[in-house]
Structure formats: structure tokens, C-alpha cells
Amino acid sequence: MEEPNRILFVSQEIYPFLDVESPIRLRNRQLPEFFQSKGFETRTFMPKFGEINERRNQLHEVIRLSGINLIIADADHPLLIKVASIQAARIQIYFIDNDVYFHRRKGVVDADGVEYKDNDERCIFFARGTLETVKKLRWTPNVIYCSGWMAALVGLYVKKAYADTPFFENAKIVVSLDDQEYMTPFGTKFADKMLVDGVLQSDVRSVAGLPVAY
């Protein structure tokens, strides 16, 4: 029997978990719904921002997938995985959570509309956390669709850090960098923070020591 086509959706924002309805958030809900209706297997990931109401959206933690520590900027950051369903669309969403990076903070800006200084680390954590979870699920995507700047590093890690991982070796990467309004560049240490086993200085040389606009 032929293996089903599998698409991994890695999205910065999805409606209705983020309340404001926008074309980007609607698209990130509708794409998995459409492909699943056509017989594709899908998995969908997004950050668990603090503004997402866990009770209303019926999120619950998946203990068997949680508990990994990701080292970023020489500090350990526990990875928590939560899930919820969009019943009308018949799709399940996996949420990447961490008390410092996501759980207590709304979106990518603070209450005054100022972007968080560690958005670069949050971006790294989201990308690595998603791939570690897919690996734990032992799920092999044919296509990885990344929406938003917070998902943009997934391709780098798939091709470098996970180059020898069977689950990702044949995956095609599609990146949609949407026109999102927050544009403060990442700091000059972003390249160093991206480094993990498999990602070399030469892989990030083009942004080393520079502020990185996303």
C-alpha cells in the first residue's frame, strides 16, 4: 500500500486560538483542513502564546511529549507540549510552550506594544521544539510548510541539525514570510544562539555579528 502524503504545518498564528480574525490566521487554519479533506495526513504546530485561553480552547498537556530541555544562550529551557482541536475543521493543533518564552507573554510584543528583546530566542525555541516533537511522534512529513518569521528557522534546522534524521531527510520545505507589522531586528548575537550540533559557523556566517531583520 502506498504511504499517504504527509504535510507538517508550522504556523506562527492560527485562528481561532488568536482571537483577531485575519487573512493569515484564517489561511493557517484552512490549509490543514483542506489537505486533510483530500486524504493527506497533517500535523499542525503553533506557539502557545499567553493570550490563548487554555480552558476555553480545551488545551491539555501531552506528558509523553513534554520534558525535553532545549539549550539556548547557555540556558536550559523545558519544552511543554499541549494539544487542542478545532472541532469544526476536524484538525488537531500542537502547541509549543515554555513558561519563560510563551506561557506568561502575549504574542510578540508587551503591553506597551514593544517587541520582546528575546524574540530571537523564542523563534529558535519554537523551531527546535517543533522538530523535536515531530521526531518523538515518529512521523515523517513529505512537505513542511512554515508560515511567519517565527517558523522561518525550521528549514535551517531540518537541513543541518537534522540532516541525518530519517524523519526529515526527504522533506520539501515551503516558507511563507508574511507581511507582519512588527519589524525590530534581532540582536547581533542571533547567529551564535542558532548554533547546535550540525549547524556550523559557516552556515550562519551571513548574519554573524549583524542585526537581523525578519
Language model feature labels by segment:
Residues 1-214:
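Catalytic cores of nucleotide-sugar-dependent glycosyltransferases that transfer UDP/GDP/TDP-activated
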